[in-house]
Amino acid sequence: MEKSVNVIGAGLAGSEAVWQLVNRGVKVDLYEMRPVKQTPAHHTDKFAELVCTNSLRANGLTNAVGVIKEEMRMLDSIIIEAADKASVPAGGALAVDRHEFSGYITDKVKNHPLVTVHTEEVTTIPEGPTIIATGPLTSPALADEIKQLTGEEYLYFYDAAAPIIEKDSIDMDKVYLKSRYDKGEAAYLNCPMSEEEFNAFYEALVTAETAALKEFEKEVFFEGCMPIEVMAKRGIKTMLFGPLKPVGLEDPKTGKRPYAVLQLRQDDAAGTLYNMVGFQTHLKWGEQKRVFGMIPGLENAEIVRYGVMHRNTFINSPTVLEPTYQLKTRNDLFFAGQMTGVEGYVESAASGLAAGINAANFIQEKELVVFPTETAIGSLAHYITSASKKSFQPMNVNFGLFPELETKIRAKQERNEKLAERALNAIKKVAEEL
């Protein structure tokens, strides 16, 4: 009997995974619960519905999200094909007519002879090769199944992420390397603040604008993970006993203890990204740039991933997933989309593309593909499966995830162009070998 793959969820990741499978001659059983059962965020019965913005972000190759889109074009992505066809004027970004976009994908996927669509809710994970791409609003019944499969402690229901900064953009003359009380190796970059600097920062923080919660996010639980601005409003000294505690962090240049200290912790294996410890936040992105830019050393900080707190269902990928998007404990089960800890429309589709290719290779008994880390697709897969297990949070694609160039280039645009060129050369080789 001819083998088929189950794909659960017809969002961006699921639709892309289906497309990659059928392009390789694999039959697909696609399960989508809408419109029989709607989520609080969706409004149509279309596949790959865009529930938030209609922008797929930058299109140029000096931006990592532009590079990942180009890689996907080279691998016959239906999501990018649909976006190009449904594009609307948006300067340097790729924005789409959302109805035309999802209509195009629905039509192509639904009417493909190798696809059988089942309009029903899946509450148990089926046997046999399967891709789970059920997104941030996965139904409670299926979430329970996933929890049992991955382990209770490895499934999360909301993001609470602090901003992540590119190391090259930190003013190293103003910060110092040290661990609290000099315990272990000096692993943190420390941003010292005088009382005057702290007071100005505090005032800006407590008066900054926060992002509005969407209706379906109102139940987000913040216990044990309080936004920094909420903590600050509890009193001017509260942060000094929390994330900005200066005790044990004397400045080696002066030998004195600063009034307040923000610690930055290395976020990736290459040491190119640092996160702001304890600074999970719900501030608007522009406000994050303005307010956090008042901290000494971060005046010109490039934030590659803004702090967020929102409803999201995702697994601890560094613990449970392979870079092929396979579950470590069950090799015929793949995950794709935001559930894996990739963040954003394009990133979700890219993970679906990789999972689809690998599920096809699995069923056809071919070698699975680990995308090179020099590629945008590969750098993202590498990050979500190798980041810190203890503090794993979802991530957008960005150049900070890419391995450094052999020759260091200081000019940012030129460096990004070289990273893009290297990525596209690498993906070309992958495409030729598929």
Curated annotation (Swiss-Prot):
PROSITE patterns: GIDA_2
Entry EC number(s): 2.1.1.74
NCBIfam families referenced in this protein's UniProt entry, alphabetically: gid_trmFO (TIGR00137), PRK05335.1 (NF003739)
Alphabetic keyword roster: Cytoplasm, FAD, Flavoprotein, Methyltransferase, NAD, NADP, Transferase, tRNA processing
Binding site for FAD: G9, A10, G11, L12, A13, G14
UniProt protein name: Methylenetetrahydrofolate--tRNA-(uracil-5-)-methyltransferase TrmFO
Entry keyword annotation includes NAD: yes
Entry-linked Pfam families: GIDA (PF01134)
The keyword Protein biosynthesis appears for this protein: no
First-level EC class: transferase
Biological processes annotated in GO: tRNA methylation; tRNA wobble uridine modification
Family to which the UniProt record says this protein belongs: Belongs to the MnmG family. TrmFO subfamily.
Function recorded in the entry: Catalyzes the folate-dependent formation of 5-methyl-uridine at position 54 (M-5-U54) in all tRNAs.
Cofactor or coenzyme needed: FAD
Cellular location(s): Cytoplasm
Primary location group: cytoplasm
Catalytic activity, as annotated: uridine(54) in tRNA + (6R)-5,10-methylene-5,6,7,8-tetrahydrofolate + NADH + H(+) = 5-methyluridine(54) in tRNA + (6S)-5,6,7,8-tetrahydrofolate + NAD(+); uridine(54) in tRNA + (6R)-5,10-methylene-5,6,7,8-tetrahydrofolate + NADPH + H(+) = 5-methyluridine(54) in tRNA + (6S)-5,6,7,8-tetrahydrofolate + NADP(+)
InterPro entries found in the cross-reference section: FAD/NAD-bd_sf, MnmG-rel, MnmG-rel_CS, MnmG_N, TrmFO
